[in-house]
Amino acid sequence: MEGHGAQRSSPLARDLTRAFTSYNKHTVLLKKNLKETHAFFREMRQNYSNTCASSTLSSDSSSQETGQFSCISFPSHEEEFLRNTVGAAPYILVLGQDCAARYQLLNCLLGDRLLPLGPEAGQACHGGQGNVCKRRKLCFTHGRQTRLSLALPGQYELVHQLAANCGRWETVPREDLEILDECEDPAHRQAELEITLHHPLLQEAKVMVVPCPSVQPIEEALEDCTRSVIPIILYAVNRDSLSSEQVADLRKVKEILSFPVCYVRLPDASAASAELGQRCEKDKSKLQKQLLSRGLLGSLSGNCSCGAPAQTAAPGAKPQSVVGENFEKLHRILVPFTRQVLQNQQVEAASLLNGLHCRCLDLFINQAFDMQRDLQITPRRLEYTREKEGELFTSLMTIANRKQEEMKDMIVETLGSMKEQLLEDAANLEFTDIIVTTNGDPVTSKEIKSCIQQIQDLIVVRLNQAVANKLISSVDYLRESFVGTLERCLSSLEKSHIESSVHNITSNHLKQLLNAAYHVEVTFHSGSSVTRLFWEQIKQIIHRITFVNPPAITPEWKRKVAQDAIESLSAAKLARSICSQFRTRLYSSHEAFAASLRQLEERHTGRLERTEDLWLRVRKDHAPRLARLSLESRSLRDVVLHGKPKLGRELGRGQYGVVYLCDSWGGHNPCALKSVVPPDDKHWNDLALEFHYTRTLPKHERLVDLHGSVIDHTYAGGSSIAVLLIMERLHRDLYTGLKAGLSLQERLQIALDVVEGIRFLHSQGLLHRDIKLKNVLLDKQNRAKITDLGFCKPEAMMSGSIVGTPIHMAPELFTGKYDNSVDVYAFGILFWYLCAGSVKLPEAFEKCSSKDQLWNNVRKGARPERLPCFDEECWQLMEACWNGDPSQRPLLGIVEPSLESITVRMCNCGSEQKSSSLEDSC
């Protein structure tokens, strides 16, 4: 064979080459996406680990951030699968019943008689004992020159004189294929024959022909194909059935490589090919029945004469083993089988990668919502806590200042009602730890003091309990109206700022201050401030009672001691003392609370600054970058699965892309294709986020379905990259529909459809921001669907950019601070067109000569005029929707039933007179 020049290529080889070329091209993109994903995750981990290391004063903030983004990584099993799959080299593995079958199939693949067949092949593999075939493994690779060499697998080339190198050859010499019996060199016996050819198929994939079983067991021969290889396993069959040894080998292949097998039935030299074809068409061959019975072939609903499945497998379906019964039609089964195996691996890898992108992107978006809420709610909570504490302090001080006289009267009343009972209880008091004689003989001075102390304690306990119960009722209402709310708000602030043990002590101290100063639990058991002050004051007064001579301990004496103690109490002084000390402690607690709250606020301020910085990074960098990776992985999956869509005629042009007709793609027919060429990274990021928001939305009948996306790297001759968004094709847009004419009932139904679609978007946390006539599409029944979610974003991901169509833009859009009420405003303008029944601009907008003038007029309050044909209720609804104050615009949950009632009133039977003005005049 000539050492230079490309090999001839058969139609089978050309189609296989195209399949492998497509696989390798997509593999490059998949590897790039995986590499960038790894780099992104690595950068995220480094950034947040550095943030944690530097945030020594705010371990809570750092732990919050790391907790939020700890799942920004590959699960171990997914990482292992991607490592083994992405970038795996395609290999055609040629197995067979014997060497003759394998060689015949290899020659068919390459379209040339490279390996010897027939008599020149020599001894068959199933020769008699003593004549066992010993042909080595063959590896076909690509090279500019044709050459043969012996090499140890994965190691080095052996210096050995091959017969092929001694002269010209067309077929590989038989002696180079075999291991001679006299060869005793173990390296030479283990070596494989590497055949380098300048063949298009070998440029895209390597080919390996397994050796004879006597040379190397099948499990050892396939050992190198278990890692980073995608094998296309072909099994050549040249007899009607398989031997038990061959079935066992196939089971081993199935265990080693979890890939399907294509069984190729080779023509039998002893039977005419026409006769063989007729036999295949009549019934399943003996081979196919054997493979089915041994579990080596999946059950098939029906095959054509070539052995290929009668029905094409669904896109993305797991490939199954197949049998090619007709060698003349091998092309019809082998090429689809190869494509399906290659496609399945790439689709699975791209889907797994895209699933990871979407999970992490959803995490970023959810965290953006949480951070935005934290930034909004924490300052309000702090202000609310300060305000409510001030109200509580003022209320308690009012009680201390104004309730003194009430306390005095309450104490006098309590003493008066309890006096006789107290005296009786004191007279009957049994002293503890003191022995008193029955005749009341005098005792020592020390025992007298103990008796007096016990009588005092009795009076103090009874009075304290009675007065405390009445004090509680005077301030008890504060507990629920102030303290309960304060505690809940404070608890939420503390939970969002648990930083360290030191800061826990501060938070606990703040709680203790509230419990001690403001709960006003003046029961005896709690030992609260007011009760304790009252008790101490009583003790001080009673202790001033003196006794000169030790008296006899009699009931009369006990009664006298109790009487003197009660009469010594001054209700006025006691009330004044209680209120004075209560005020002092209130003020002290108020100051301590305020200081602690300021300290907590300072810490929250630092945390919120870090949160806002992180929120900006998520919105501006992290989420857009990840969205772009997600768009690329999803588009790669779609193009592998469904191919590149074919562009039809142009349907329309917009600010950011061109819309084409697409007859069929991915099982959808017909489709619309939006071609977008992002000019810079910002537009790329916006488009990627749009695609993510749209694709992750559940299907809804009022939204246009997005079927998929494909990134066209060959756009404009490869100078630009275009993103092709394939979506549902509808009949026309609302602008065209209004120009053609729509009935009143159709227009009101369209209004209801649009409101339903916007409500669904809002329920998913999204704003459309560009509701207008061109973005509402109509089907053949004139039912509406919202399209073009190019400006659609969650509130938490909005950066305040000014987007939309000027006529439909709410005034607050120009300030950059807005919410989902901008869609209500835009609907109000859209509803004006629907009620007008035409596309003529309102007078207020028609006279504007430029976009800037139009914006200025909208900001100044310019709105569409009322047309004579407008129904009063419709006009009121429009005005409410485009109200300049966003808070005054109605919720869509109110707009929808209003529209329904308008529709029922104006379109039902008997309402022709009411609706005739709208129907006829506009």
From Swiss-Prot:
Determine if ATP-binding is one of this entry's keywords. Answer: yes
Top-rank taxon of the source lineage equals Eukaryota
Record-listed E.C. numbers: 2.7.12.1
The cellular location(s) given in this protein's UniProt record come to: Cytoplasm; Cell membrane; Apical cell membrane; Basolateral cell membrane
- Indicate the residues that form the catalytic site: D770 (proton acceptor)
What GO molecular function annotations does the UniProt record carry, in alphabetical order? ATP binding; protein serine kinase activity; protein serine/threonine kinase activity; protein serine/threonine/tyrosine kinase activity; protein tyrosine kinase activity
Entries under CDD domains matching the protein: PKc_Dusty
User: Reaction(s) catalyzed by this protein?
Assistant: L-seryl-[protein] + ATP = O-phospho-L-seryl-[protein] + ADP + H(+); L-threonyl-[protein] + ATP = O-phospho-L-threonyl-[protein] + ADP + H(+); L-tyrosyl-[protein] + ATP = O-phospho-L-tyrosyl-[protein] + ADP + H(+)
Q: Which GO terms describe its cellular component?
A: anchoring junction; apical plasma membrane; basolateral plasma membrane; cytoplasm
Q: Which residues form the Protein kinase domain?
A: 645-899
GO process annotations (BP): cellular response to fibroblast growth factor stimulus; embryonic organ development; negative regulation of apoptotic process; positive regulation of ERK1 and ERK2 cascade; positive regulation of fibroblast growth factor receptor signaling pathway
The protein's matches in Gene3D superfamilies, at most eight in alphabetical order, are given as: Transferase(Phosphotransferase) domain 1
Q: Which Pfam families match?
A: Pkinase
Positions binding ATP in this chain are L651, G652, R653, G654, Q655, Y656, G657, V658, V659, K674
Keywords, A to Z, come to:
ATP-binding, Cell junction, Cell membrane, Cytoplasm, Developmental protein, Kinase, Membrane, Nucleotide-binding, Serine/threonine-protein kinase, Transferase, Tyrosine-protein kinase
What is the annotated role of this protein in its UniProt record? May act as a positive regulator of ERK phosphorylation downstream of fibroblast growth factor-receptor activation. May induce both caspase-dependent apoptosis and caspase-independent cell death. May play a role in the embryonic development.
Query: Family, per the entry?
Result: Belongs to the protein kinase superfamily. Ser/Thr protein kinase family.
Annotated protein name in UniProt:
Dual serine/threonine and tyrosine protein kinase
Q: Which organism is it from?
A: Tetraodon nigroviridis
Q: Which gene encodes it?
A: dstyk
